[in-house]
Amino acid sequence: MSSRKHLANAIRALSMDGVQQANSGHPGAPMGMADIAEVLWRSHLNHNPQNPEWADRDRFILSNGHGSMLIYSLLHLSGYDLSIEDLKNFRQLHSKTPGHPEYGYAPGVETTTGPLGQGITNGVGMAMAEKALAAQFNREGHDIVDHNTYVFMGDGCLMEGISHEACSLAGTLGLGKLIAFWDDNGISIDGEVEGWFSDDTPKRFEAYGWHVIPAVDGHDSDAINAAIEAAKADPRPSLICTKTVIGFGSPNKQGTHDCHGAPLGAEEIAATKAQLGWEYGAFDIPADVYAGWDAKEVGAEKEAAWNAKFDAYAAAHPELAAEYKRRVNGDLPAEWEEKANTIIADLQANPANIASRKASQNALEAFGAMLPEFMGGSADLAPSNLTMWSGSKSLEANDFSGNYIHYGVREFGMTAIMNGIALHGGFVPYGATFLMFMEYARNAMRMAALMKVQNIQVYTHDSIGLGEDGPTHQPVEQIASLRLTPNMSTWRPCDQVESAVAWKLAIERKDGPSSLIFSRQNLAQQERTQEQVADIAKGAYILKDCEGQPELILIATGSEVELAVEAAAQLTAEGKAVRVVSMPSTDAFDKQDEGYREAVFPSAVTKRIAIEAGIADFWYKYVGFGGKIIGMTTFGESAPADELFKMFGFTTENVVNTAKELLA
């Protein structure tokens, strides 16, 4: 049987070889954390390489994702479907081993990491999901949800502000199944971190309410093992502070930034292997090392034991077991489609002129009763975002059976935590803040789009309609920024019906995030036929039309739709042939077939005006260079909303005059 050190050296060898073959990458962190990884993966991690989707597996996250050869080596050695050829293709086009770990490529990669700090934050979300799912489904004698979340993170993760947001909340909520390892190697790209990172990290985490295990030798297997055992036994989240040597084993580069982000070079690799006693060539792993690492048999036994436990649970609680399966499979309730469509039809039949943020809350009230998988929240703005409904129950450290998270003023942390909740499974997470403060969270929403995970964001107070709070709180360019993000679905509804449709589609969308943008001010409900209600889902549809071919098309979203309707009525009375298109979602419209898009926007009709209280430039795509845009070209001002709309040209008079100029 190979020694622990010999098995850990397999990680070091593969990491050196992979980075050298790619001629780029980060060998230092994998070499430094290899001993920790060997103890965790071989003695503690419950997983099954033959079924990476096993619901009750432990989750492992490499938050310092630049050290990706570490996780690729672990997955390969443990027996996942990741071959030695895949490792040789590290960082190559269309490989399963991209430069940073990406969800959906290599089996066993739980989340995409690389932007530092987001991995630990995803881990907080996964641990929250585990604790909530356990509270909702476990019954006496039947702990079917019972797994840990393990996170490796480096100095960079801890320097990023998001780590404070997430780890603070993790301590407050008592996430005892979360165990993080700090790779305390004292090195970052610029050199020794003591010049820019001198925090007392153990005291920092003690202040959060974490269980802290300081000064663990990251190259002493017995010390690492004892620390993990202590962490698993403590009811608080745990930070294991492991002192490591970056690039461990490299005679000339270990302990320096020279081994952080570049290949070691052929000579140094040879010297390192000699020093480690590793007598094998590039990508050469001997049979005894593979045998020592192989987790397939043990993993299958662990899953089989859990399956037997679940069968007993299903016999005792058949309805709960069926509901658990539905939830973790991500299936909607059987009656969902029919009931949701009825709710939308009823809203159209019973008009209400309300703010779309209130319409959003009403949609939550209607849909929430059918969706126990909802896990809502807000970044300390629930009374403004209107994200709580009658069925909302807040999560508390001692009671996680609820469905609502008070994230505090942590927009970035909230959004990345939601990514972790979505990745874990069993929940449909939604969160909220003012649209302006989407900026704090932008990269986490980009990560949701990149990973194709369901993350529903409610962004309220969507324009200069916010009024007196002024330009610091008035969004201008934010909607365009969201629309320009690949795989982001963005909706800005004009009334309660469009709001409910947007919510329905966001709930049904499993392959990416949704941004639902709502107003502070009341909006007039529009009249629609049944066919028009059905067409809302297409992203843009003809709301008001003329006889025959229009000479002018007015395009509007959200609060500006009623402005377009009023202007069209006045122009029609003056003999103009005008069409009004409500366009709540440009990305949904862009996915429609050419026939539908041509029917809404005939190419022969070039006189077009877009009206939106957001950045104007975005709309040239739809109006063309010959069209006009009534939008924002500057930041807002502090004043009552009515005065601002008038000042910036969002009036019936200005729309009519602009139309006449265009038609002249």
Swiss-Prot record:
Mg(2+) binds at D155, N185, I187. This is Transketolase 1. The record marks H26, H260 as: Important for catalytic activity. Thiamine diphosphate binds at H66, G114, P115, L116, G156, N185, H260, F437. Catalyzes the transfer of a two-carbon ketol group from a ketose donor to an aldose acceptor, via a covalent intermediate with the cofactor thiamine pyrophosphate. Its cofactor is Mg(2+); Ca(2+); Mn(2+); Co(2+). The active site is at E411. Transmembrane segments: none annotated. Keywords: Calcium, Magnesium, Metal-binding, Thiamine pyrophosphate, Transferase. It is an enzyme of class 2 (transferase). It comes from Aliivibrio fischeri (strain ATCC 700601 / ES114).
